[in-house]
Amino acid sequence: LDREDGSLIHTASMAGILTSQGNLTYATTKHAVVGLAEWLSISYHDKGIRTSLLAPLGVNTPMLGGTDSKFAKNAAGTIKEPEDVANMVVDAIQEERFLILTDEIAQTWMERKTNDLERWLNGMRRLQGKMDSMP
């Protein structure tokens, strides 16, 4: 901060933007990361500190393999390799872009949520019901 120059990268998840089913702690802490990144961007961008938010759907890491979510791998979209995600982050830093999405469908889902929140919530409730009824 004293140098008034630099980049901060916050790794959240689409779970922090769209809310995921299954793991309360995961979803709420990812929401907190989104809020922190937005606040820092608003508060420090004009002071030379650039903030980016990485919100992947699925990255090929041990965490993805060890998940207990019934739909996690399916909902993760196209699983990205860590090296590809790292390249996306570097591009975003160079472009001074805030939001880093790893999958094109994520932008569509964000738009659907913001365009009609009630419809989005109803759809997510239906999905939760399907998950709850799975063996």
Feature locations, PLM:
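Conserved catalytic-site region of short-chain dehydrogenase/reductase
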Residues: 16-18
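Catalytic tyrosine of NAD(P)H-dependent dehydrogenase/reductases that use a Tyr as the general acid/base
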Residues: 26, 34
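SDR active-site lid
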Residues: 42-105
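Helix-to-beta-strand junctions that scaffold the AdoMet/dcAdoMet cofactor pocket
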Residues: 1-4, 45
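Residue(s) in the substrate-gating loop at a strand-loop-helix junction
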Residues: 13
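Active-site loop immediately N-terminal to the catalytic Tyr-X3-Lys motif
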Residues: 20-24
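Active-site helix of classical SDR
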Residues: 29
